[in-house]
């Protein structure tokens, strides 16, 4: 590490210590991040991603408890004949069918090599570059685990699960576990026998088009009071709709430079719903829901951190952890359709023998 880099890096460590009310020398020992610092970090992370701004990132004080129930569940309009002594009954619109959450520890550990710090030290925004590098990767990992996580292993294996499948139970797996009746992954006949292990869309398939599939799923897997909700969207995998339907609609910033424009909205609607593409969503699936129906809960005093140098490997190591849970606020407000295969499934015409053959 160059002398200029050392000076700026020490100033960064002093700033981290100041924000968390500890001595600069204690940054290399595990410390609890101040809740206000965690809140600022989570807000900044949310603002760094268009997708994360559209969902809920919620601090909770307990490791486990009842969902907050963000958004109204069902209708609340009613009539009551009070003249006959009947009292009006208010509806608890936060009452949910499956209403529990449980935050578990997720680690965000990484290192920065000395030569990278030496490069960043040439710029005035040295501390900002370190912070932004952390926030960008954490933002992407929150999204990746949310859409691909199927379990929480005691010790995760990134080589076997490159999409963070074993880090946490994400939103899609929550649907599979908690609301399997709202998940479509195969085709059955009227007697419940499986006729296809995948959902075929196209000529000769189970559905003539993606529009027909979305309309059928919406009508049969989502509760009636949500079917006409103006905030419903279809989060669609990249294999299902051609790239030409997804021009970038965010004109305020350059998508090639900023993570914030990571939600791409199609000009084409599917089943009369806006089609949305987000990072790391499974390529052969669709999630029909309101984006505000998806939440990340984090325990606000669970944030732990330690920053230490490892000169034997010429790098600075940052160990960070937080207890979080991926939450679907109301399963009735959405459904998951997966194992979708688009193509031509019509029976090939039999070859005819040529005359004289």
Swiss-Prot record:
The gene is N. Keywords: Capsid protein, Late protein, Virion. GO terms for cellular component: viral capsid. InterPro entries: Phage_P2_GpN. Pfam families: Phage_cap_P2. This is Capsid proteins. Residues 1-9 form a propeptide. It is found in: Virion. Its main location: virion. P2 proheads and capsids consist primarily of N*, a 36.7 kDa protein and two minor components, H1 (39 kDa) and H2 (38.6 kDa). It comes from Escherichia phage P2 (Bacteriophage P2).
